[in-house]
Amino acid sequence: MSAKVKRLTLTIALAALAVGGVRTIYPSSSQIITARPLALNTDNPAQKQVGMLEFVAAWELRSRNENFGGVSALIALADNRFVAISDAGTVIHFRVTDDGRIDRATIAPLPNLHGPNVSYKDRDSEGLAYDPDSGQYWVSFEGKHAIRRYSKSFAQQTGLVRPIVMQDLPRNKGAETIFRLQDGRFIIIAESLDDDIHSAWMFSGDPIESTTTKTPFQFRPPPGYRVTDAVPLPDGRIAILNRAVRFPSGFTAKVSLLSPESIKGIRHESVISAEVIAALSSPLRVDNMEGIAVTNQGNKLFLWLISDNNFTVLQRTILMKFRLPDQPHSKKPEASTAPGL
């Protein structure tokens, strides 16, 4: 088989997996996660710059736990600790040490999502929001469109709502992204596209509470891409992760920044967009990128990206760390397109 045919065959397989591949089960309850360092570009190991982002490190994460994988969202806590959720209703806690090891790992099911009367549609968790003051989490689900609230450390479910505005969304194309702004408002972005635009909603407060008002608006991603996750930055900007599957290049990802002014300008049915600051495509390290989080070290900001392996042997759970520039530039260049797989 020629190299070109091999690349095309792999790309077709990856495209199928992106929509939900065949799960590979390893019966184990291990709580150990290992990390193997990866280069950004094996063809050019010295490369560090990707658009406006500076590459710091990348790892392939592995665990023998049967519920590890399928990561769909990522939140950063203090001390390089992270919380991830999978689209199988699992919550994953871990810490990245200074020397690139994983410790303090736990892999456990979300409360209230397992049992004889619960189907996969109930467990299809996609988005994750966090309130650092109360320690509460909010998880969005796209199989049966819902938002669930959890107490500190996911000890118990404390609320459930199925917003009427989301019930007409296509199956498995619901609330892909949820994040909480510093002032307590929430934004939810649906995975589905209509004329290349995402449906989205601004919630005036906790989405679980009946008194919270909703402002529908639309978000336009980069052409050919879909939003998979987003995270507020300390300065009020929003970092957005966008993903695409293309032939023959396979998975690609773009990181964009939404300005505070754009958020302030959200009105009923308004259309907003963000500026692309970096693009990942082959030969750069990239997979089915689904989660994004932010950490800081003094004045330095770091973006962390994580991929969804769809519980298959053909994909990997990749964690990547990039540094944001100290000051936003007036012009944010996009990384040049790289050759395909």
Predicted features along the sequence, with ranges:
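Sequence/structural signature of beta-propeller domains
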Residues: 2-341
